[in-house]
């Protein structure tokens, strides 16, 4: 389902993420928000939630001069993104993740949990695929140990577990976390 709003979100994301690549790869970053939107669209046809998935990293990763929270509110009216730290300096990895977990845990928008689940599914899918291809070399692209990365995904899942996120999405994320756990515990 490609509505005018979804098409607008895709255009904005493509422009905002132009020239960016996925961490440690040559894959254009735009693949990630598009994939998150596609994952969400498999479980809901709610336009605002799909748009939120496509735009979910813009406030965190894109210079506000390119696209700001004000622009997002103008273009999409309601707050379509999970809470981000727009315009704030980038904190160390652990502090960023703890802050994200706190904001997500305090969210009362079911859409934020759906977007977070789809985002983590795509991120973990890429991590596991890259691990299969490159082995332990992939951990160097992160500012955290693989044990900390596992901790983070488990913490996100613990927040999502009891929320009304489609059960298939939760199962998918849980299975990916188990795969990551197997890698981390087998090869610490």
Task: Specify the residue positions occupied by each region the protein language model found.
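Active-site helical microenvironments for divalent-metal-assisted chemistry
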Residues: 1-188
């Amino acid at each position: 389902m490609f509505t005018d709003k979804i098409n607008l979100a895709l255009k904005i994301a493509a422009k905002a993420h132009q020239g960016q690549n996925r961490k440690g790869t040559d894959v254009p970053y735009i693949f990630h928000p598009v994939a998150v939107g596609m994952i969400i669209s498999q479980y809901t046809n709610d336009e605002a939630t799909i748009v939120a998935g496509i735009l979910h990293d813009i406030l965190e990763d894109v210079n506000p001069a390119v696209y700001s929270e004000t622009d997002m509110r103008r273009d999409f009216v309601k707050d379509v993104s999970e809470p981000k730290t727009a315009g704030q300096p980038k904190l160390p990895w652990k502090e960023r993740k703890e802050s994200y977990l706190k904001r997500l845990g305090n969210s009362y928008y079911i859409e934020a949990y759906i977007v977070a689940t789809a985002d983590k599914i795509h991120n973990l899918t890429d991590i596991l695929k890259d691990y299969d291809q490159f082995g332990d070399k992939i951990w160097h692209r992160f500012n955290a140990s693989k044990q900390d990365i596992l901790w983070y995904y488990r913490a996100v899942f613990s927040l999502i577990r009891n929320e009304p996120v489609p059960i298939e999405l939760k199962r998918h994320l849980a299975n990916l976390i188990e795969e990551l756990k197997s890698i981390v515990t087998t090869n610490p």
